[in-house]
Amino acid sequence: AEMIREKLGNSPLADACIDSVENGASTIYALPVKETTHGKISKADHQGTGKGTIEASGNPTNDFTLIVQIETSGLTNAATCVISENGGQSWGDEQTIPLSVTITVPNTGVTLTFTASEGNQFVAGDTYTFEATAPAANNGDILDAVKKFRSYMVTVELIHVVGTSTAALWGSLESLGAAME
């Protein structure tokens, strides 16, 4: 899994390849398709009594739920937090909310901006939850990738398209698949 993430990043394609290997695939050819729609990150769903705020920005690399939990109350450079990139299943190390007010969450494409002032501090136990959506490719880019793959002259059992798709894409893929037989 680690080697796949090194090659493909924290992406839906990496997730699909890892799932395939874990379920018995012995050979995988992975062809990333350039995103045409950037990932999106929601506004914070804040639970708790603190008045400090956190905003998320950037272009998420995958679908995930990002949670910031305040561990120690206070202003920036005093309050501490932990961050989960998987909806609270696991947590990163406790870190001080920096005076520079931003934390870049590694391998996610997301930067968090923290704001606090006297009377508007972070409070221990508060959580800030963000929903991220993965980037997406358009139908034309996916079809071009399948055509490019065809030029590799390798025998394949199936082609797995990762991401959101439409009926129009599947109709086009069916026609292309028939031509490839």
Feature map (PLM): residue ranges:
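Surface-exposed assembly/interface segments
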Residues: A1-E181
